Amino acid sequence: MNLQHHFLIAMPALQDPIFRRSVVYICEHNQDGAMGIIVNKPLENLQIEGILEKLKITPESRDSAIRLDKAVMLGGPLAEDRGFILHTPPSRFASSIRISDNTVITTSRDVLETLGTQQQPSDVLVALGYASWDKGQLEQELLDNAWLTAPADLNILFKTPIAERWREAAKLIGIDILTMPGVAGHA
């Protein structure tokens, strides 16, 4: 089982404060473990434009029609000071890894320098931090019913409102997650 380019959808009973009601996009999954980015947990009061200001990135060819007021996600509990940018191709940046035909993850500053310009990728999600599982750990969590899995959907990843991503990701596999046991007040 390879879950690269899949969503992990937290089961309603999962109460860990970081992963509760989370959707994790799996960037890498192999015999050594897995790595992913939480795509529905916005950091409070932090938007892309704030990251660019903090890093003193002010593109000369800024296009004011391109919005930079999108929320930055808490990508996971590890390396929360490190940026991870999920985006659509191209993958012309210094530190890019193609995850699928339609998704790339980049960790280098050069992708940030394109944000707000005509050179930026068409779809972008910026996160600080990531989630990781050791060898066999994710598989055990799946056996323990902590997660549902679904093939990733770019519309949910990049366009669905953040507050709706958990429910919409579960709908990919025909489940209304709000009616499942463990979701109080929605049965």
Swiss-Prot record:
Gene Ontology CC terms, in alphabetical order: cytosol
Q: Which domain of life is it from?
A: Bacteria
Pfam families tied to this protein: DUF179 (PF02622)
- Please give the InterPro entries that the UniProt record associates with this protein: AlgH-like
Q: Which family does it belong to?
A: Belongs to the UPF0301 (AlgH) family.
NCBIfam families tied to this protein: PRK00228.1-1
Protein name, UniProt field: UPF0301 protein YqgE
